[in-house]
Amino acid sequence: MAAHCRGTELDLSWISKVQVNHAAVLRRAQQIQARRSVKKEWQAAWLLKAVTFIDLTTLSGDDTFSNVQRLCYKAKYPIRADLLKALNMDDKGITTAAVCVYPARVCDAVKALKAAGCSIPVASVATGFPAGQTHLKTRLEEIRLAVEDGATEIDVVINRTLVLTGQWEALYDEVTQFRKACGEAHLKTILATGELGSLTNVYKASLVAMMAGSDFIKTSTGKETVNATFPVAIVMLRAIRDFFWKTGNKVGFKPAGGIRTAKESLAWLSLVKEELGDEWLTPDLFRIGASSLLSDIERQIYHHVTGRYAAYHDLPMS
C-alpha cells in the first residue's frame, strides 16, 4: 500500500462551513447510474481489474480456521487458471487486494497465507466492530493486538454518536489515537454512513477522519440497514478530492456492503474514475469490501470465455 496519510491539524472552520446540496448529489448519482456499463469487449479486462481491488472478507460468527484458509486460497487464486490462460492473463499474478477478518482470526489468515507462499495483506476489523460502542481503551487494545498478530491493515469503526452530536474534536482525537495504535499498519476508517443522519454529516466525518490521518475512508461495516450507496460515495469522493487539493494528501476510498454483482463492481470503478481519475484506480487508493462479489465476477468471466454461464459445480468455492 502507498505511504501513510500524514493527516493535518483539525480545521474546525472548514468543517463548520460544510453544507451538502442533497438534491444535486442525487441528480449526479442518477446521471452516473443511468449510463451504460463498460462495452462488452472491454468487460473482461475491467472485471479482472476489479478483482485486484477486492478486500475478500469473512466476518461471520461461525468463522473457523478452515473458513479462513479457504478464503485465503481463493484470494491467491481468485479466477480459475484456465480462464486466465484463455485471456492471456495467466502470468500476471492476479490476486485480491487483501483478506479481511475479525481480530481473533488474524493469526489464522497469516498462517494460511504463509503456507500458500503468498504476501497478500491481512486486514482486520477492530474497535468494537460493527457498532463501535466499547470503551476507548478496549478499542485501542484491539487494534494493537491485531497488529501484533500480523494484520497490516486495520478497518476501524467510528463512534457514530460523536458525529450525530457534532463532537468533531472528540472524533478527531479518537481517530488520531487509532492511527497511533496502528503503528506501521494502514488505517481504514469506517464511517457507517447509513447511521450518520445526513450527507452533510458524511462529508464532515470524512474530513475529520482524513485530518486525523486515515489512509482510507470506508462507507460501511456491511452490517447496517443501509450500506454503500452512490449518493454517499459521491459525497465521500468529493471530500477526498477537496482534501487532496487543499493538503496534497491522497486518501483511499473503500465502499463495502451490498456490492454483490460484477455489474455493480464496474459501476463503482466508473464512479471512482469519473470523480477522482485514473490515479485512484489502484489498490493503494481503492478497495471494495465484499464476500460474495468475487463469485459473480468469476461467473461473468467464465461466460465471456466459454459463451455459457457456469453451473455451481464448474467453479471452486470462495
Curated annotation (Swiss-Prot):
A single BP term in Gene Ontology: deoxyribonucleoside catabolic process
Pathway linked to the protein: Carbohydrate degradation; 2-deoxy-D-ribose 1-phosphate degradation; D-glyceraldehyde 3-phosphate and acetaldehyde from 2-deoxy-alpha-D-ribose 1-phosphate: step 2/2
GO molecular function: deoxyribose-phosphate aldolase activity
Listed GO CC annotations: cytoplasm; nucleoplasm
Record-linked Pfam families: DeoC
Active site: D155 (proton donor/acceptor), K218 (schiff-base intermediate with acetaldehyde), K254 (proton donor/acceptor)
Keywords of this entry: Cytoplasm, Lyase, Nucleus, Schiff base
Main location: cytoplasm
Keyword Acetylation tagged: no
Listed name of the protein: Deoxyribose-phosphate aldolase
Source organism: Mus musculus
Primary gene name: Dera
